[in-house]
């Protein structure tokens, strides 16, 4: 084991011997007190930290001494951090969130590359955190370790899979934390726990020494409360930027994604636009696009994964297809990595994770080549959209988290929206930053910024430049009397109904059925849509379908019987 590693399991933590003589007396006293309190916590002699449940392993890996001049000073002196349970640490077994995994694997012979880098830059690792089993959950609930308590909203789940890392940061147990992000594993808990998150471009930070879920989607990311610490960790882990900024930055808002939210624009889009307007320089006027339609037009190989749709719904269909490709790719690669272990050990898994693992190990790889082609096309298309100075702005999450211990499952509508948002960066391999935006209905909300693959330091710099202005606008937005949120799905379904009615009047029965079906897909609780489609079916002599629609209309609204 590295001489810098000191385990809390033995209770033999020593004072920081690396404090150099030239440090001021006050600084020495502060550091000594920090070290003393940390040792007491590690030995279990002090009361547990608030919001306990974040950690699964308590340990301490201390950094080497600050090098003497002329060597560069460490970037992260005196900062503490934690890592998820899928990071290897020499002499310890990485549990991957599951006791059967821990039981069937040996202690690591090396420490993860990213952890070593952070130690070298002066940070101290104080523990390993709870995560959803095998990196597959999204709620933060773990059958074996329990659910870490969300400091930002204790009555709800913290989000996963890197729940413990987000909770440790939000509860101020550490200054920052590492985790892996495959399909939102860091971005989801960051949003639910109200902390900052950075998911770097895929392949930019070494994943050596981490347990893989899906190797072409996995990235090592980090969480922090302070944007300066978020940026400093980036300076430590990311390669040096190739060149400086070549022009003013431009925010590109994904309007169709924000239309899927039930949060007022005054608390999301307007906050960011107003913040950027107050900045003296550095940003062009923002642009607004329909990202779904852009994907539909610029990722040709995605068409085989799209459901049949009207022209009006093409964008939504493309977004759903993008997240389908992401999830299929994850299943294929998880199966390649872990099928033998799953079939041999037959691990005990929580219900949600068990379902996802079974989907992965039972996956058939008929169209694998197409998945990778879509990924390549989407990365190129997003790069073409954003170029060197563009930043895509989109929601992080689709809504509020589930209640703790409610035994509810996420609705398919919630999952579809959530995965659509996270797939934009995940499948393109682009970098994404998540920034808290205060609260809505007593739950944390956030917004995300995506830059092209490789533009990581550019994006971190932009977040630093915007952050203070965003905080001021959050305060102003919280004081506004906001109108009720319009459900845009209802608006769209009514528009489709009217298009169906117009087609019916023109005796275009098949076209009318297509529009009514689109309205039903968006809102399947409106009896009128079924009645109208039944009338069109009758005109075509499709009596069985007409009868089925009439029956459904009656189930939804008994009063409608007089119309049938």
Regions found by a protein language model. Give the residues of each.
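Gly/Ser-rich catalytic/binding loops embedded in alpha/beta enzyme cores
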Residues: 2-175, 380, 384
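Short, Asp-centered acidic motifs that coordinate Mg2+ and/or phosphate
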Residues: 124, 175-176, 221, 391
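Short, surface-exposed loop/helix-turn segments at secondary-structure junctions
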Residues: 370, 401-419
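Gly/Ser-rich, acidic/histidine-flanked active-site/gating loops
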Residues: 6-20, 33-35, 81, 87, ...
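Alpha-helical tetratricopeptide repeat
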Residues: 2-3, 20, 160, 474-564
């Amino acid at each position: 084991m590295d001489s810098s590693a000191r385990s809390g399991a033995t209770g033999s933590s020593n004072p920081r011997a690396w404090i150099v003589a030239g440090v001021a007396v006050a600084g020495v006293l502060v550091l000594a007190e920090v070290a003393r309190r940390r040792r007491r916590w590690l030995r279990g002699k002090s009361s547990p930290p608030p919001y306990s449940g974040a950690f699964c392993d308590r340990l301490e890996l201390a950094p080497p001494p600050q090098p003497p001049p002329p060597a560069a000073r460490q970037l992260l002196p005196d900062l503490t951090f934690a890592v998820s349970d899928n990071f290897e640490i020499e002499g310890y077994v990485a549990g991957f969130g599951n006791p059967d995994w821990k039981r069937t694997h040996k202690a690591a012979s090396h420490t993860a590359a990213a952890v070593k880098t952070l130690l070298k830059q002066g940070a101290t690792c104080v523990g390993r955190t709870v995560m959803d089993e095998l990196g597959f959950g999204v709620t933060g609930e773990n059958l074996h370790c329990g659910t870490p308590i969300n400091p930002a909203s204790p009555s709800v789940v913290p989000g996963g899979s890197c729940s413990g890392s987000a909770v440790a940061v939000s509860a101020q147990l550490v200054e920052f934390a590492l985790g892996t992000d495959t399909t939102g594993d860091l971005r989801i808990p960051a949003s639910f726990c109200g902390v900052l998150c950075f998911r770097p471009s895929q392949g930019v930070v070494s994943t050596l020494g981490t347990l893989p879920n899906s190797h072409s989607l996995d990235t090592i990311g980090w969480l922090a409360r302070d944007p300066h610490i978020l940026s400093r960790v980036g300076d430590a882990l990311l390669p040096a930027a190739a060149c400086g900024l070549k022009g003013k930055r431009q925010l590109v808002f994904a309007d169709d994604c924000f239309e899927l939210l039930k949060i007022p624009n005054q608390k999301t889009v307007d906050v960011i636009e107003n913040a950027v307007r107050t900045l003296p320089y550095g940003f062009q006027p923002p642009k607004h696009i329909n990202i779904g339609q852009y994907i539909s037009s610029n990722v040709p190989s995605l068409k085989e994964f799209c459901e049949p749709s009207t022209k009006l719904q093409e964008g939504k269909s493309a977004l759903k297809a993008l997240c389908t490709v992401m999830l299929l790719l994850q299943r294929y690669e998880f199966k390649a990595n872990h099928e033998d272990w799953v079939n041999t050990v037959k691990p005990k898994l929580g219900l949600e994770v068990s379902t996802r693992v079974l989907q992965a190990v039972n996956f058939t790889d008929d169209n694998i080549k197409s998945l990778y082609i879509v990924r390549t096309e989407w990365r190129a298309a997003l790069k073409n959209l954003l170029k060197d100075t563009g930043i895509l702005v989109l929601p992080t999450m689709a809504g509020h988290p589930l209640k703790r211990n409610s035994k509810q499952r996420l609705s398919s509508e919630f999952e579809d929206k959530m995965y659509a948002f996270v797939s934009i960066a995940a499948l393109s391999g682009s970098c994404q930053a998540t920034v808290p935006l205060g609260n809505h209905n007593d739950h944390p909300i956030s917004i995300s910024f995506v830059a092209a693959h490789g533009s990581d330091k550019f994006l971190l710099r932009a977040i630093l430049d915007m952050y203070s202005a965003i905080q001021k606008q959050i305060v102003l937005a919280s004081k506004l009397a906001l109108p009720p949120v319009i459900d845009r799905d209802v608006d769209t379904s009514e528009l489709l109904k009217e298009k169906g009615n117009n087609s019916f009047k023109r005796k275009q029965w098949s076209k009318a059925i297509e529009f009514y079906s689109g309205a039903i897909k968006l809102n399947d609780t409106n009896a009128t849509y079924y009645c109208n489609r039944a009338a069109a079916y009758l005109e075509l002599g499709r009596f069985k379908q007409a009868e089925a629609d009439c029956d459904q209309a009656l189930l939804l609204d008994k009063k409608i019987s007089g119309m049938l």
